[in-house]
Amino acid sequence: MIPYIENNKLSYKYIYEKDDILQNFSIKTSMSSSGKLITIYPKDQLSFQKILSELYDRIPKTTDGIYVMSDRSYRDSNNIFYRYGFFKEDINYIKDGKLTLNGLNGEIWQDYPKNCFDLPSWIEDIQESDLSEESYLSEHYIINEVLKTSSGGNVYKGIIWRL
């Protein structure tokens, strides 16, 4: 992966120290940053899509990875995730202490650590959203409340509605 990044002169950051990697992959790390071993910063939308496509072709889909809660997985990859947001803090975009974008129709979107994938309403995602994905949980339980969240898993309160 690093040779690809450097050969294409991409901006990136990565976790270097083994102890830091283990810490990042532990349940002690915030859900918004857990699992992010390497982060690439594309220069524009076109390079973003090219990078995703090329990495998807290079990294085996069968390789297990850590699910990144704040990002969206690319296609059926377990290792390639993306999100929308600022690369660095810019004082010109700070509102109420958070990096903020304003849409053409006055919409406001703030970039801060989140536990789920989030796009501004005026930005079209590069993939179709698949909200119909079924799971054992969704097929058998009605969730009433989230009791605890962590990068190691969540605890829910709900009722069984189908055995």
Give each language-model segment a name.
Residues 1, 144-163:
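ATP-binding glycine-rich loop module of kinase domains
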Residues 1-23, 27, 103-127:
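Surface-exposed, low-hydrophobicity interaction/linker segments
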Residues 2, 50-60:
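Short amphipathic alpha-helices in soluble, non-transmembrane regions
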Residues 26-31, 38:
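Extended charged low-complexity segments that act as oligomerization/scaffolding linkers
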Residues 35-37, 152-153:
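Extracellular structured ligand-interaction cores
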Residues 42-48:
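Helix N-cap motif at beta-to-alpha junctions
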Residues 60-82:
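Conserved short beta-strand edge segments in small beta-sheet-based binding/regulatory domains
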Residues 88-146:
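Juxta-kinase regulatory segment immediately upstream of eukaryotic protein kinase catalytic domains
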